[in-house]
Amino acid sequence: MGLIFKIVMLFLFCGFLHSQQDSLTTNEYITTFPNKISTRISLVNTSNSFIINDVANNAKYELKPNVREYLGFSVLFRSIEIDYGFSPKFFNANKDNDNSRLFNLNIRTFLGQWMQTIDLYNQKGFYFSSNNQRVNLSGVKTFKIGGSTSYIFNKNFSFRAIGFQNEWQTKSAGSFVPSIYYYYTKYHLTLEDIDEKASSFDIAVGPSYYYNFCLTKNFLFSLGAHAGVGLNHSSNLGEGDFTSILYDFSGRAVVGYNSDTFFAGINSNIILLEHKIDASTVQDDTIPFLEFYIGYRFNAPKKWIKLADDFNKKYGL
C-alpha cells in the first residue's frame, strides 16, 4: 500500500510541475485526453458473496465476507488503467473483523474498439447465515480471477467516460457491446479438523447495451446492462464434479462530473453468476460494486507520449 500511495502522490505532484496547457482533443461526440495522465482516489464498497439455494429442502444459505470497504487508487494513461485497493481497519464496515482481509485488483485496457478487463478478488474471513442465525468463519478463504472481453460497436460511444474518465462524452450516445465473461474461483475452508478445497470455472457470452446521457456540458448519467448464458464446472462444491448451465447478468449506473483537469462521480455495478452445484442446489455468485471517487488530470511526460504514439503507429491503433 505504501509504495502505491507514494506513486500516486508523485504523479499528482508532477502534475503541478507541468504547464497547464490544454492538451485535449475533441470531436462531436467525445472529448479525449491523449496527453494526460488521470489519477483517482476512491472509496469502494464491494465483495464477492455466495448464496446457496437448496431447492430440495427449501433452505437458503448465505456466505458473505466480513470486509467490504476499501480505499482505491487508480492511474490511467491512454488505453491502460490500473486500480489498486486495500481495506483500512477504521472503516465501520471493516471493524471487529480481525484475521479478515480483502484484496482487489482491476486492470482495464482499450485497443481500438476492443475492451479487456481483468479482475482479482482475494478474500479471507466470512460469516455464514441461515434462518436468522449467523456464524463467523474466519477460516474461509476465496480467490477469484477473471474478467471480460468486449467489443464496442458505436465509435461515438465512450465507455472510458463511465467512471474511468480519461475520455468525456460530449453528446449523448449508446452502443451495443457484446461480451464474453470468464472467472475461476477457488474456495478453501479450514475449521478445527476440517480442511476442504473446491473450485469453480465460469464462462458465458451475451449482449450488452450502454447509453451515456449528457445532462449538461459537465454532467453525465449512464445506464447499461448485460445478460448472457454459458457453462459452469464446479469441483467439490456439491456432489463432486458437476457441470451445469450458467446464467450471468450485470448492470451499471454512473453519475459523473468532468472538467479539463478535475473529475468526480459515483459508479455502481453488479455482476451475478447463477448455476447449479448439484441436481437440486443452485448457487448465486454475486459481486456488487459501489464507488465514490475524485480525480485529477495532468500532462504526461513527453517520453511517455512519444512511446505511446510510436506504439500506436507501429501497430496501426
PLM regions and their residue ranges:
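Surface-exposed strand-loop-strand hairpins of Gram-negative outer-membrane beta-barrel proteins
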Residues: T46-Y70, E81, G85-D96
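Residues on the lipid-exposed face of transmembrane beta-strands in outer-membrane beta-barrel proteins
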Residues: I41, L71-F77, L105-T109, G147-F153, ...
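Transmembrane beta-strands of outer-membrane beta-barrel pores
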Residues: L43-S49, F77-E81, F86-N92, L111-Q113, ...
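Outer-membrane pore/translocation modules
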Residues: T26, L102-S200, N269, F311, ...
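Predominantly the C-terminal beta-signal and adjacent terminal strand-loop region
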Residues: F249-S250, V254-L317
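Outer-envelope beta-barrel architecture signal
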Residues: F33-T39, E69, R78-I80, G112-Q116, ...
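Bacterial Sec-dependent N-terminal signal peptides
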Residues: M1-Y29, F219-F221, I294, F298, ...
